[in-house]
């Protein structure tokens, strides 16, 4: 298929606001694709060249893109810069400059060229990337050029995520949207959307019956529900239950296939290179040939005090020093870590997601030998809520976040990608009267004054309305930031500034920020009360006013979460209603 048809669809989708209409248009497009076009297009719709667990960055920033655009269209870089300053979008600049009326570019041509740019590395790679980019722009029509530039820069900005695509797959490949729920479940296990699209195109609805976990391809993490009190725990989890320490670190999945070992973050990113000591110790202490483990990496050290060995857990912020590509050995010494495994998902050819938690825990203990770095989560098994409360208090004294209480029932399966009713978390903030922390998406910022001049004064934050797959504002956050926090947030937001309310974001007129931010950055916030508010759009309906979070205070950036992992409108409303 010609790339022109995909570019024209992108243009249509950018202007379409109806959820149903977006899904319909995408499904019609996929019905007409053949062979590798299905897989390639699935990636392109998400502005990528592969799944999240591959390094899909093309390595081209604005400066190189300006050079490529100038070279492609025979204009000066200064001309491109001026047009960019006016439009705020290098894709629009390419659209303005391109004079080509006809193009023979196919989807495969464009996808392969993007792969070529991505895989070019080493000495002279910047010049080669620029030449490859410039060359394909010369062959493209204005519409094609606009979206090629956006794809190269990773700024497609269609205003929707993977859930729209999965609903479209249901219609295109099974003929009925009712299969969307099963397809979404399958996507939690097969997190490669291109591979999933290919399997569905070839097998239809029956494909969801044989998609399974595969070592080397991370699954979406199972998450915990929230409870209001220890008494509620007793109602939610009958009989015997396990209480495990909850660590304030980075969620990790470790996949071992023979000598090959990889670590993946909650966002499914490959973080293997950041934690070489964990990879080394897994190789020594985990004898299984094929295994997938779920755990938490924490900044941690064992120290000796007064002749006693004690565990020292350091704040999550310390761990962020390890999120780097360079000076790994230096920061390995500065910030020692341990990984606490609490689940096993696959073992020597056998998927374990449908095995109950007690069986999985037994297999975990049989297949992981603890070392200084490789640990198993500490836990108690009891029917007594009083014992669980005592265990919780012990974890807080150790400097931990709290506990996770897990069902021991015969159907306590690992529910990938779900906030499961088999796991419940209880954190220190809850016992202090702060019922919840909120993972919110930044959608705007307000200019700072005084010591914050030149930075933001407050951030406009939103929650996810899952039904409409849009972001609705909940609060403005202006306290809790250190100078280092503000600097890091400014850096993260700078790539996502747009000139108008981003598509898929709902903001009231009286709440309009000075700067609009497309949904990309997630922050964790502590708040004291949820109230009704006509000023915010979270949960607003024909008969319901919006919701607002009062007295929010910034806690940290959630590098491990995507906007679609943020708190939902339903979760906020449930907290307000006490359900």
UniProtKB/Swiss-Prot annotation:
HAMAP family: DNA_ligase (MF_00407). Its cofactor is Mg(2+). Pfam families: DNA_ligase_A_C, DNA_ligase_A_M, DNA_ligase_A_N. The active site is at residue 246. It catalyses: ATP + (deoxyribonucleotide)n-3'-hydroxyl + 5'-phospho-(deoxyribonucleotide)m = (deoxyribonucleotide)n+m + AMP + diphosphate. DNA ligase that seals nicks in double-stranded DNA during DNA replication, DNA recombination and DNA repair. GO terms for biological process: cell division; DNA biosynthetic process; DNA recombination; DNA repair; lagging strand elongation. GO terms for molecular function: ATP binding; DNA binding; DNA ligase (ATP) activity; metal ion binding. Belongs to the ATP-dependent DNA ligase family. Signal peptide: none annotated. PANTHER family: DNA LIGASE 1, DNA LIGASE 1/3 FAMILY MEMBER. It comes from the Archaea. It comes from Methanosarcina mazei (strain ATCC BAA-159 / DSM 3647 / Goe1 / Go1 / JCM 11833 / OCM 88). Keywords: ATP-binding, Cell cycle, Cell division, DNA damage, DNA recombination, DNA repair, DNA replication, Ligase, Magnesium, Metal-binding, Nucleotide-binding. ATP binds at residues 244, 251, 266, 296, 342, 419, 425. This is DNA ligase 1. InterPro entries: ATP-dep_DNA_ligase, DNA_ligae_ATP-dep_bac/arc, DNA_ligase_ATP-dep, DNA_ligase_ATP-dep_C, DNA_ligase_ATP-dep_cent, DNA_ligase_ATP-dep_CS, DNA_ligase_ATP-dep_N, DNA_ligase_N_sf. Its EC number is 6.5.1.1. It is an enzyme of class 6 (ligase).
């Amino acid at each position: 298929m010609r790339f022109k048809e995909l570019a024209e669809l992108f243009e249509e989708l950018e202007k379409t606001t109806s959820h149903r209409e977006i899904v319909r248009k995408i499904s019609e497009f996929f019905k007409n694709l053949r062979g590798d076009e299905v897989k390639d297009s699935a990636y392109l719709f998400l502005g990528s060249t592969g799944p999240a667990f591959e390094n899909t960055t093309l390595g081209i920033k604005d400066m190189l893109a300006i050079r490529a655009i100038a070279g492609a269209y025979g204009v000066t870089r200064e001309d491109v810069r001026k047009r960019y300053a006016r439009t705020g979008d290098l894709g629009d600049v390419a659209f303005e400059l391109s004079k080509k009326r006809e193009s023979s570019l196919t989807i495969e041509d464009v996808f392969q060229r993007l792969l070529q740019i991505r895989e070019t590395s080493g000495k002279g790679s910047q010049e080669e990337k620029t030449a490859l980019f410039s060359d394909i722009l010369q062959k493209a029509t204005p519409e094609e050029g606009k979206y090629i530039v956006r794809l190269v820069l990773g700024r497609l900005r269609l205003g929707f995520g993977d859930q729209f695509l999965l609903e479209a797959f249901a219609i295109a490949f099974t003929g009925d949207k009712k299969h969307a729920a099963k397809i979404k479940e399958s996507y939690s296990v097969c997190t490669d959307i291109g591979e999933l699209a290919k399997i569905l195109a070839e097998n239809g609805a029956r494909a969801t019956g044989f998609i399974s976990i595969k070592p080397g391809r991370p699954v979406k993490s199972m998450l915990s529900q929230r409870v209001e009190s220890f008494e509620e725990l007793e109602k939610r989890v009958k009989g015997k239950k396990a209480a495990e320490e909850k660590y304030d670190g980075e969620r990790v999945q470790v996949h071992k296939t023979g000598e090959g070992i990889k670590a993946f973050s909650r966002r499914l990113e490959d973080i293997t290179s950041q934690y070489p000591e964990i990879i080394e110790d897994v190789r020594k202490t985990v004898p299984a040939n094929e295994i997938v483990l779920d755990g938490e990496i924490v900044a941690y050290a064992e120290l000796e005090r007064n002749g006693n060995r004690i565990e020292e857990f350091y704040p999550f912020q310390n761990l962020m020093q390890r999120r780097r590509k360079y000076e790994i050995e230096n920061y390995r010494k500065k910030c020692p870590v341990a990984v606490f495994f609490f689940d096993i998902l696959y073992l020597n050819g056998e998927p374990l997601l449908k095995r109950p938690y007690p069986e999985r825990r037994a297999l975990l203990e049989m297949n992981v030998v603890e070392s200084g770095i490789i640990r198993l989560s500490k836990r108690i098994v009891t029917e007594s809520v009083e014992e669980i409360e005592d265990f919780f208090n012990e974890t807080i004294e150790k400097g931990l976040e709290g506990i996770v209480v897990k069902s021991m029932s015969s159907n306590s399966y690992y529910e990938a990608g779900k906030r499961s009713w088999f796991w419940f978390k209880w954190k220190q903030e809850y016992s202090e009267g702060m019922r919840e922390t909120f993972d919110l998406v930044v959608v705007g910022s307000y200019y700072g004054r005084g010591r914050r001049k030149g930075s933001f004064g407050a951030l406009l934050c939103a929650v996810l309305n899952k039904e409409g797959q849009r972001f609705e504002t909940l609060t403005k956050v202006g306290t809790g930031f250190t100078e280092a926090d503000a600097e890091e947030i400014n850096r993260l937001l700078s790539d996502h500034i747009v000139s108008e309310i981003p598509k898929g974001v709902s903001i009231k007129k009286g709440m309009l920020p000075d700067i609009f931010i497309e949904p990309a950055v997630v922050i964790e916030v502590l708040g004291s009360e949820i109230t009704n508010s006509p000023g915010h759009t979270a949960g607003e309906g024909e008969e319901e006013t919006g919701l607002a979070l009062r007295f929010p205070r910034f806690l940290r950036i959630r590098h491990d979460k995507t906007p679609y992992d943020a708190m939902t409108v339903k979760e906020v409303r449930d907290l307000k209603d006490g359900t």
